[in-house]
Regions:
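Alpha-helical cap/lid subdomain in secreted, periplasmic
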Residues: 34-40, 53-122
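Serine-esterase "nucleophile elbow" of acetyl-processing enzymes
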Residues: 5-65
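Sec-dependent signal peptide recognition
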Residues: 1-2
Length: 122
């Protein structure tokens, strides 16, 4: 989070620009207007959202700055199964790339999903 804030602060020519936030409940519950008061912000966070659902939301981020935090709802059995882990990771990364390309942002800031407790998820 600190890295994101520092990165945005370094973009002085973009002050007062627009930031579009997309993600799951972590984004939906984030008071982005308070966190980024000098920016025009849009919060498209949806509780329970999965990465592959973003493409169905018909969002237009062309030439806008996008902050993404999504993916924790995608984690589960395949990631923790030794036989399917590598395939899951490869597919997940590919889906992330396709999603970003589909949004066509000017610039994208991807916030890493939070660690999950393996025992609880199973």
């Amino acid at each position: 989070m600190l890295l994101l804030i520092l990165s945005l602060g370094a973009c002085s020519e973009e002050k007062e620009g627009e930031l579009c936030f997309v993600g799951d409940s972590l984004v939906a519950g984030w008071d982005v207007k308070d966190a980024f008061p000098t920016w025009i912000v849009r919060n498209d966070g949806v509780s329970g959202a999965k990465l592959e659902e973003i493409a169905t939301w018909n969002l237009n981020y062309q030439d806008k700055n996008v902050v993404m935090l999504i993916g924790t709802n995608n984690l589960g059995g395949k990631l923790f199964n030794d036989a399917t882990r590598q395939e899951f990771i490869t597919d997940f990364v590919d889906e992330y790339k396709r999603t970003i390309e589909g949004l066509a942002p000017r610039r994208v800031f991807v916030i890493s999903i939070l660690p999950r407790n393996r025992e609880i998820d199973n």
